[in-house]
Swiss-Prot record:
Bias (Low complexity) ranges: 174-188, 205-214, 222-239
UniProt keywords, alphabetically: Phosphoprotein
Other comment: Present with 1140 molecules/cell in log phase SD medium.
Protein purpose: May be involved in actin cytoskeleton organization and biogenesis.
Compositional bias per record (Polar residues), positions renumbered to this chain: 61-80
Protein name per Swiss-Prot or TrEMBL: Assembly-complementing factor 4
Composition skew (Acidic residues), residue ranges: 287-298
Disordered, as annotated region: 1-80, 164-240, 286-309
Ranges of Basic and acidic residues composition bias in the record: 13-24, 34-44
Length: 309
């Protein structure tokens, strides 16, 4: 043997490359493999299929209660159970109340619907009554009902309170005027009008009068004010209720008009004074279009308004 020749102790098992349908080939080789399994292992260790590794997975299981802590032993076991019973009872009562309130709301809605249906049927019954009764009798009964409702409304406590408050509101200014008059005018006779000689003495001052101050009674108001106050008081008592309301509104409107007139007068006074914006030079004056005396003539097809500024 030459030196270049390689010495092989064991033959190397090499497989030829072949492109074949391995699926069909594998199915054909399965019975042959079963037969060879009975025989002892072949010489080549590569023929044996490798073993699949076992996968260690966590088993799926549902949680369960522990029996050890299910019934703990303690001294406070009895009050806890009683508290739980009370809580359950309270919850049951609350639920019952809620259910009853819901039923009450439903019943109220049904009642309103029934009332509306009953009102819809009323005109038909009224027409039947009109056919059976005389129209004059029906009108008389209807007017009696209306009058009775008016009387009931006017005699209601809320209406009486409202009328009383409104009467007090309108009677306050009259009472104030009368109280002022009674305070300024005590129960005494009015002084007679002075004569001509007394007037002259009052006009011509003297030294004696200057040296000794006179403490005379206060001046009396004219008789016209008393008459006007008395007449307004009697007129306010005699006028009806609605007329007094209208008079009050008219008085308020008059006061608003007077206030507006005062504002307009003040504005008119302010308008007389103003700050001059221009300095008074000739170029500050604005020329109007009427001052332009020059007339433009048309130039062919061009209109005249294009030449104007």
């Amino acid at each position: 043997m030459s030196e270049d020749q390689r010495v092989i102790s064991q033959p190397i098992e090499l497989h030829k490359l072949s492109i074949v349908d391995k699926h069909s080939q594998g199915q054909q080789q399965q019975p042959h493999q079963k037969q060879h399994e009975v025989q002892p292992e072949s010489k080549s260790p590569r023929v044996t299929t490798p073993l699949k590794p076992k996968r260690l997975a966590i088993p799926i299981s549902s949680p369960q209660r522990s029996t050890t802590n299910q019934s703990p032993v303690s001294d406070h076991a009895s009050p806890i159970s009683t508290d739980q019973d009370l809580i359950y009872k309270l919850a049951a009562k609350h639920r019952e109340i809620n259910e009853l309130s819901f039923k009450l709301e439903v019943a109220q809605k049904e009642l309103k619907q029934l009332e509306l249906q009953f009102k819809d049927t009323l005109p038909r019954n009224g027409q039947q009554k009109l056919g059976n009764q005389n129209p004059s009798e029906y009108l008389s009964t209807f007017t009696k009902r209306i009058q009775q409702t008016f009387v009931d409304v006017n005699n209601s406590p809320n209406m009486l309170k409202g009328k009383k408050s409104i009467n007090d509101f309108f009677s306050k200014p009259n009472n104030n005027v009368n109280s002022n008059i009674n305070n300024t005018l005590p129960n005494r006779k009015p002084n007679p009008p002075p004569n001509r000689s007394q007037r002259m003495q009052n006009i011509a001052p003297s030294r004696s009068s200057e040296s000794t101050p006179t403490s005379g009674p206060p001046l009396l108001p004219p008789r016209n004010t008393m008459k006007n106050a008395n007449t307004t008081a009697t007129a306010g008592e005699n006028t009806p209720f609605l007329q007094r309301i209208l008079n009050k509104f008219n008085q308020m409107n008059m006061e608003e008009d007077e206030f507006d007139d005062l504002l307009e007068k003040r504005k008119s006074k302010k308008d007389h004074y103003y700050i001059k914006e221009n300095l008074g030079y000739e170029y500050d004056e604005v020329r109007s279009e009427d001052e332009d005396d020059e007339e433009f003539e048309p130039m062919g097809d061009i209109p005249v308004h294009l030449f104007k500024r």
